[in-house]
Curated annotation (Swiss-Prot):
Protein name per Swiss-Prot or TrEMBL: Large ribosomal subunit protein uL18
Domain of life: Bacteria
Similarity-based family: Belongs to the universal ribosomal protein uL18 family.
Gene3D superfamilies, sorted: 3.30.420.100
An example Gene Ontology CC term for this record: cytosolic large ribosomal subunit
Secretion signal, residue range per the UniProt entry: none
PANTHER family: 39S RIBOSOMAL PROTEIN L18, MITOCHONDRIAL, LARGE RIBOSOMAL SUBUNIT PROTEIN UL18M
Gene expressing this chain: rplR
Complexes and interactors: Part of the 50S ribosomal subunit; part of the 5S rRNA/L5/L18/L25 subcomplex. Contacts the 5S and 23S rRNAs.
Keyword entries, A-Z: Ribonucleoprotein, Ribosomal protein, RNA-binding, rRNA-binding
Length: 117
């Protein structure tokens, strides 16, 4: 099993458990160059809030979009947007990525900005 297949297998298992809970989830995806975050409704078919380093407003503030500082900026932005929509509590879906580095930086920044998970 290659690295990508193993990550997808981990993500599928975690998503199955989160679906049983019926909670709003904060989904994170990372690539070497960018990081993306979405808040998805409990039914799984509606994206309530999104933020990423691809967005011009976030990317202009950054020197490079693929590091911890960029992830923290996305985490802060996603939390602010979620709180504006009245979403305070989410379940964290790391998409099979290790909770370390950029994924952890995004989660910590979102917590500091007021999102609970």
């Amino acid at each position: 099993m290659d690295k990508k297949a193993a990550r997808i297998r981990r993500a599928t298992r975690a998503r199955r458990k989160l679906k049983e809970l019926g909670a709003t989830r904060l989904v994170v995806h990372r690539t070497p160059r960018h990081i993306y975050a979405q808040v998805i409704a409990p039914n799984g078919s509606e994206i309530l809030v999104a933020a990423s380093t691809v967005e011009k407003a976030i990317n202009e503030q950054l020197k490079y979009a693929g590091n911890k500082d960029a992830a923290a900026a996305v985490g802060k932005t996603i939390a602010e947007r979620a709180l504006e929509k009245g979403i305070t509590k989410v379940s964290f879906d790391r998409s099979g990525f290790q909770y370390h580095g950029r994924v952890q930086a995004l989660a910590d920044a979102a917590r500091e900005a007021g999102l609970q998970f």
